Swiss-Prot record:
SUPFAM superfamilies registered for this protein in UniProt: CinA-like, Molybdenum cofactor biosynthesis proteins
Pfam assignment, any one: CinA
CDD domains, alphabetized: cinA (cd00885)
Source superkingdom: Bacteria
Protein name: CinA-like protein
Family, per entry: Belongs to the CinA family.
SMART domains according to UniProt: MoCF_biosynth
Organism of this sequence: Mycobacterium avium (strain 104)
Ranges that cross the membrane: none
Classification via InterPro entries: CinA, CinA-like_C, CinA_C, Competence-induced_CinA, MoaB/Mog-like_dom_sf, MoaB/Mog_dom
């Protein structure tokens, strides 16, 4: 797919380079660029040393990119060198922006006024020393457009070939600045050659990647214009995400591909608009009251269900019943049931779900009990054995249910995360059929 505007990303910070902090900015900026029709050439990560930062800038310039976006290194400390390096790279002097310096000073005053521990710093003499220490953040490349700070660090956009957008490292500061940064004249000129395209996401669950790959090979011959579709797939939490980018002229080809996938994998294709299973479950739970009973996942499912505003409208509560005694005392599971079938069994999962419905007066419940490892497995029930029970019905009454046992692959973390995904999909299916 021909795309003329190209960009590169430089993520700075020794803490990111060494893995102490996971990079959230690179992927986020990449998504925003792709949404704009800008081809992403490279994402590079380097430490805080100036010559390393400059080397990354020169590398990207040598690749012929039209735009470089950097994140990090805009603070007041000695190792925050990104703006200085970018100025040198662009052949521009650093100058003090008095207006920005005043804005930073006002931000500092407000922050300190809200924190009693810093009240003494508001003394005029002390504050002036602090203000001077932060003055570095108001030094910007001559001719650059300054982006108002969200924290205390302003961003800058430096015109040129390539143009450079310099953004702070904390995502909570970087993301609000992005829209303003990309709308600046320098950034718009840099990406003027971008291709207008559409991007769609399909989500599938229960379909192996090999199965999707086989269908896509079939589509190459069966779908006219298939070659105009840029398709990427990603396996995440046991699901397949398929992202397709295409120019508007290839819309018919995409529609035919979607129909082929729907015809062959309709049971596994659960989202055609990019909605996550969490989104779908939240909608399906409207007007209901759900409770969870978890053993091996230790509250991860409850956390996932409540990881959105408004979840208190339908989440009643949850129980983490890790021990057999907790299953009996908190969920009313008969100890004889555990003795006969074992804690990791379908009868116990059913009893846990019924107990959760009863305890929270809920009409919907999900129970998970399993062996996440690395120990605890047996020949009959190896590590990765997980039992699920989803129930829909008034507490104390007979409920519609789906109870099953699965063997999930991976390490302890993988098994626990996959278990929550399976539970969400079992819940989605049962509620959809309600």
């Amino acid at each position: 797919m021909p795309v003329s505007a190209r960009a590169g990303i430089v993520v700075t910070g020794t803490e990111v380079l060494t893995g102490r902090v996971q990079d959230a900015n690179g992927p986020w900026i990449a998504d925003r660029l792709l949404e704009l029709g800008v081809e992403l050439a490279h994402i590079t990560i380097c430490g805080d040393r100036p010559h390393d930062i400059e080397a990354q800038l020169r590398f990207l310039a040598d690749q012929g990119v039209d735009l470089i976006v950097t994140s990090g290194g805009l603070g007041p400390t000695a190792d925050d060198m990104t703006v200085e390096v970018v100025a040198r790279f662009c052949g521009r002097e650093l100058v003090l922006d008095a207006e920005v310096e005043e804005k930073i000073a006002n931000i500092l005053k407000k922050l300190m006024a809200r924190n009693p521990a810093f009240q003494s710093a508001l003394d005029p003499g002390t504050f002036e020393s602090l203000r001077a220490a932060n003055r570095k953040q108001a030094m910007v490349p001559a001719g650059a457009q300054v982006l108002d700070p969200v924290g205390t660090a302003p961003g800058v956009v430096v015109p040129g070939k390539p143009a450079v957008i310099v953004l702070p490292g904390p995502p909570r500061e970087l993301q609000p600045m992005w829209h303003t940064a990309i709308q600046t004249p320098a950034a718009q000129q840099a990406i003027a050659g971008r291709t207008v395209y559409r991007q769609e996401m399909l989500r599938m669950f229960g379909l192996p990647e090999s199965g999707l790959a086989e269908t896509l090979r079939e589509a190459e011959a069966a779908v006219p214009g298939f070659g105009q579709l840029e398709i990427t797939t990603c396996l995440r939490r046991g699901e397949i995400e398929m992202v397709t980018r295409y120019e508007p002229t290839a819309a018919t080809a995409y529609a035919q591909l979607t129909k082929l996938l729907r015809d062959k994998h309709g049971d596994q294709l659960y989202s055609e608009d990019g909605s996550r299973v969490d989104d779908l479950v939240a909608r399906l739970l409207a007007g209901r009251r759900i409770a969870t009973a978890e053993s091996c996942t230790a509250g991860l499912l409850a956390a996932r269900l409540t990881d959105r505003p408004g979840s208190s409208d339908y989440v009643a509560g949850g129980v983490v019943a890790y021990s057999n005694e907790a299953k009996a005392e908190l969920l009313g599971v008969d100890p004889a049931l555990i003795e006969t079938h074992g804690a990791v069994s379908e009868p116990v999962a059913q009893a846990m779900a019924a107990g959760a419905r009863q305890r929270f007066a809920a009409d919907t419940a999900v129970a998970i009990t399993g062996i996440a490892g690395p120990g605890g497995g047996t020949e009959e029930k190896p590590v990765g054995t997980v039992c699920f029970s989803v129930q829909v019905g008034p507490p104390g009454a007979t409920a519609r249910s789906d109870t099953r046992t699965l063997r999930l692959p991976g390490n302890r973390l993988d098994i626990r995360e996959r278990s929550t995904t399976v539970a969400m999909h079992l819940l989605r299916r049962l509620l959809t059929d309600a």
